[in-house]
Structure formats: C-alpha cells, structure tokens
Amino acid sequence: MSQDYYQVLGVSKTASQADIKKAYLKLAKQYHPDTTNANDAEKKFKEINAAYDVLKDEQKRAAYDRFGHDAFQSQQARGGGNNGSFHPDINDIFGDFFSDFMGSGRRKQTSSKIRGSDLKYDLTIKLEEAFHGIEKNISFSSEVKCDTCHGTGSEKGETITTCDACGGVGATRIQQGFFTLEQTCHKCQGNGQIIKNPCKKCHGMGRYHKQRNLSINIPAGVENGTRIRHTGEGEAGIRGGNNGDLYVDIAIKPHDIYKVDGANLHCKLPISFVHAALGGEIEVPVIEGGKVKLTIPAGTQNGDQLRLRSKGMSKVRSTIRGDMLTHIHVEVPKNLSKKQRELLEEFKKESINEKENDSSFFNKMKSMWS
C-alpha cells in the first residue's frame, strides 16, 4: 500500500506550498544517492520525489486530497510518475534553495500579497446521504475580500506608493563587518508599499470578517473520514493574495440497522425458528430504501450469514456496489400456546425416533457408553 504523500514529506494536509517545498528540499538533500550511502536511500528518494511531484501542483494535490492514490493509478499503469532510476541533479535541486537563503547578488522587489489561511469544516451526514450523495449548505465565518476597495486596502481613487525606505523590497540591509544582514522594513512592515489613505471598511487589509454560506457537493459513496478540498474557498488573501482552501472533513453517523465495512454493509436479521427450520422468503430493508426478498434455506442455523450481492454501499466514481451481509439470529419463543406446545411435543417425539433409527448416530452413542 502506498504511503500517504503528506507523511512522506512530513507535513500536514493544510501545509502551504512554501512548507512543502522546504520539507522536500530538506529530505531530498538527506536521501539523494549522491550524498548518502544508506541502503534505502534510492527508494526513499523516489518516494520523496513522487510525493513532491503531486503536492507541488495545485490541481494534482486537489485530486489527491479527494481520491487519494486512486487519482493517479491509470497514469502509473501507463508508466507515468517518477518511478524510474532517474535522479535529479543535486545542484538543480538546491539551486533555488541557496539563492533563497544566501542571496543572489541582487535584491528582488518583494510582493505585499499574502495568501489567505486554509479553513477546516467538520460535516456530519447520514449513511443514506453518503450512499446517494447529497448537496449540503454549510455556514461558517471567515475573512473575505473587501468589496469596497476590491482588496487593495486603499480608499477608492487613492494611489498606493512604493515604500521609499526599502525601495519596495520590504527589507533593509545593515552592514556589520564582513556580513550584510537584512531586516524587515520598519516603515512598510515588510509590505514594500505604503497605503496613505487606508480603506475605512477593512482598515487597509483588503479583507474583513463575514459569515458565509456555501453549497458543498458530497459524492455518492463517500466514506467516513474523507476530506474534500475546495480550492479558493478559504480565507481571502491580504492585498490581492490568493485565497486559502477549505477542507471539509466528512463524518458518517452510526446507523441503527447497518454497520459499514468498506463498501459492504452488515445487519442483524432476526427470524423465527420455524423460518429457520422450514426455510422460506423474508423481506429485508435495503440502504437505497424499500425492501427486497431474501431466501432463507431450510435448516438455517443461528449465526449463519446470508449475502445480498450489490446491495451494499455505492463507490465514488464507480457503478459497482458492495454487498449486504445478513447475520441470522434465530428467535425462540418464550411463551407458547397449548396447541403450539402439543405440536412441539409431537415434533420432539418424532425427532427422538429419527435419532434412534439413525444407526450411525446410535452406534456413536453406544460406543461412548461401552
């Protein structure tokens, strides 16, 4: 079974792209075959690259968050993915790393845009809703883009100027002996821009707090614990930054009749001892609604399991369904009428005579006492 990509890189499912890249660079340096002789280095390096290849791409990541490794099975079957023996050059991997942390000899103008935070929402649904799929309306509060300044943070018609203290870089440099240190610009607070007349509604942030309503589509066959990612539905970014994402975690309520086992459903089916002995048909409820007939074989024993094929849960992106397994519970009556007792006494006599006439049974009993 493939390991979870987030676990491979050691990051959370809400990690930012910067966190994912940082974790990848650290692990790639540790396990690159050119830098270590560890026996499992090549295998680990392949896993790290496969995980990063998916998580660095927003579309691939969204598909992985929703469907897991199944989203890429067809690609792997065609030979896709980074499963060969090719190793990216160690210098290529860390080229950006060293330019980011050591400096490239010239200063780049930084952007004041900040990505919005991701949000998490816990949604509980019924088993029937998980089977059929459903559209749910959810309500939550978050930071939204200011509709007065359109996210600029400035009053309408006012201009935003480049910070004259740092030249729009967002940081100033201090020379200390042989070393040059950078610190956040005290004038623009690292934004690189100065808003002379901030928007009164959002106080210059380009966003404000608001209660939101959103329609969430739950696919048929969703499982308990599934996380659905809605790209761009998290908190609004600051000063034009990208929105964060919304993660909806699905929990399915325990059902009164069914227990879920993957795509299969289990239920306890009580039947009379007459049905168990003689057999017959009995109607049982099914998850899609209504009832179907189940054949009870004559001589069914307590604890027997009878299967109704394709009457279990639906599966995401599939027409195949699981099965429903009924666990037989034979009920013995506690109170009998006079006629019922007489009939059972007669049945008892017949049963004893049958056993005595059964030579194999009689011989077994005789051998025990001889």
UniProtKB/Swiss-Prot annotation:
Domain of life of the source: Bacteria
Keyword Zinc: yes
SMART domains tied to this protein: DnaJ
InterPro entries: DnaJ, DnaJ_C, DnaJ_domain, DnaJ_domain_CS, HSP40/DnaJ_pept-bd, HSP_DnaJ_Cys-rich_dom, HSP_DnaJ_Cys-rich_dom_sf, J_dom_sf
Cellular component terms (Gene Ontology): cytoplasm
Protein keywords: Chaperone, Cytoplasm, DNA replication, Metal-binding, Repeat, Stress response, Zinc, Zinc-finger
Repeat region (CXXCXGXG motif), residues: 146-153, 163-170, 185-192, 199-206
Gene Ontology biological-process annotations: chaperone cofactor-dependent protein refolding; DNA replication; protein refolding; response to heat
Annotated Zn(2+) 1 binding sites: 146, 149, 199, 202
Sample GO molecular function, one term: ATP binding
Subcellular location: Cytoplasm
Pfam annotation, one family: DnaJ
Zinc-finger ranges (CR-type): 133-211
Binding site for Zn(2+) 2: 163, 166, 185, 188
Free-text cofactor note: Binds 2 Zn(2+) ions per monomer.
Cofactor(s) the protein requires to work: Zn(2+)
Boundaries of every J domain copy: 4-68
Gene3D superfamilies: DnaJ domain (1.10.287.110), Heat shock protein DnaJ, cysteine-rich domain (2.10.230.10), Urease metallochaperone UreE, N-terminal domain (2.60.260.20)
Similarity section: Belongs to the DnaJ family.
Role summary: Participates actively in the response to hyperosmotic and heat shock by preventing the aggregation of stress-denatured proteins and by disaggregating proteins, also in an autonomous, DnaK-independent fashion. Unfolded proteins bind initially to DnaJ; upon interaction with the DnaJ-bound protein, DnaK hydrolyzes its bound ATP, resulting in the formation of a stable complex. GrpE releases ADP from DnaK; ATP binding to DnaK triggers the release of the substrate protein, thus completing the reaction cycle.
Quaternary context: Homodimer.
Domain notes: The J domain is necessary and sufficient to stimulate DnaK ATPase activity. Zinc center 1 plays an important role in the autonomous, DnaK-independent chaperone activity of DnaJ. Zinc center 2 is essential for interaction with DnaK and for DnaJ activity.
Protein name: Chaperone protein DnaJ
Classification of source organism: Bacteria, Pseudomonadati, Pseudomonadota, Alphaproteobacteria, Rickettsiales
Gene name linked to the record: dnaJ
